[in-house]
Every structure is written in C-alpha cells, then in structure tokens.
Swiss-Prot record:
Source organism phylogeny: Bacteria, Bacillati, Actinomycetota, Actinomycetes, Pseudonocardiales
Domain of life (superkingdom): Bacteria
PANTHER family linked: 39S RIBOSOMAL PROTEIN L12 (PTHR45987), LARGE RIBOSOMAL SUBUNIT PROTEIN BL12M (PTHR45987:SF4)
Family to which this protein belongs: Belongs to the bacterial ribosomal protein bL12 family.
Keywords assigned by UniProt, alphabetized: Ribonucleoprotein, Ribosomal protein
Signal peptide boundaries: none
Gene Ontology cellular component terms for the protein in this record: cytosolic large ribosomal subunit
Coiled coil residues, start to end: none
Protein source organism: Saccharopolyspora erythraea (strain ATCC 11635 / DSM 40517 / JCM 4748 / NBRC 13426 / NCIMB 8594 / NRRL 2338)
HAMAP family per record: Ribosomal_bL12 (MF_00368)
Pfam families the UniProt entry points to: Ribosomal_L12 (PF00542), Ribosomal_L12_N (PF16320)
GO biological process: translation
Protein name: Large ribosomal subunit protein bL12
Length: 128
C-alpha cells in the first residue's frame, strides 16, 4: 500500500461526513490505544480566561439532541432536513446515539429554528 502524504490524508478527511469522521476516530483510538481528549489540567486555565467574555451575548450555538422521544422516525426525518448531506443511515445513528450535537457553531436564529423543528417532531433538544 502506498504511503499517503499529509495533504492527501487531509483531502480524504475533508470528503468524509461528521459521522464517518467520528467512527474513524473511535476506531483509531481503539486500534492505537490512545484518546483524543484534551488533558484536564490544560483545559482549566482556558475556562478561567473565558469567564470574562461570558458577559457578552453568545453568538454561536451548538444544537444538541438530548433524546428522540417516542416519535423517532419523525425526528430522523427532521434531522435529515436540518443537516445537509446526511443519509438515512447516518441520521438514524445520530438520533439513536443521543445525546449528540446535530449542528455546531451556528447563529442564534438557525439554532432556534432547528430546535423548534426538532421539538415539534417530539425530540428533546438543548442549545449550548
């Protein structure tokens, strides 16, 4: 097998969906017995520094699916509608794997719109 350059690897990753990347990351962690989590000691100073800007209004939100509720099929349909390029299988895995982020770093209007649609379909959703 030919060795891929860093640029070629990045091109391959750019073509993958978020779910495919997540699956790859889990497999990579298991294969090499490593974890992608940041050390806790390194994250603590960043959190202290972030407390001051917290007074400003947040302009980027993550839409997190907490639970699909009783109407899982309806929620899957709405997830496919909200997340562009998501196939039925990926949407189903995303819904069944809740709690999981559906959208990341979106503006307030889009986050509220997605939250409303998901809640109308029976899902429990939070904005972070």
């Amino acid at each position: 097998m030919a060795k891929l350059s860093n640029e070629e690897l990045l091109d391959v990753f750019k073509e993958m969906t978020l779910l495919e990347l997540s699956s790859f990351l889990k497999e990579f962690e298991e294969t090499f017995d490593v974890t992608a989590a940041a050390p806790v000691a390194a994250a603590a100073p960043a959190a202290a520094g972030a407390a001051a800007p917290a007074a400003e209004e947040q302009d980027e939100f993550d839409v997190v699916l907490e639970s699909a509720g009783d109407k899982k099929i309806q929620v899957i349909k709405v997830v496919r509608e909200i997340v562009s390029g998501l196939g039925l299988k990926e949407a189903k895995e995303l819904v069944e794997g809740a709690p999981k982020p559906i959208l990341e770093k979106v503006d307030k209007e889009k986050a509220n719109e997605a939250k409303t649609k998901l809640e109308e379909s029976g899902a429990k959703v939070s904005l972070k």
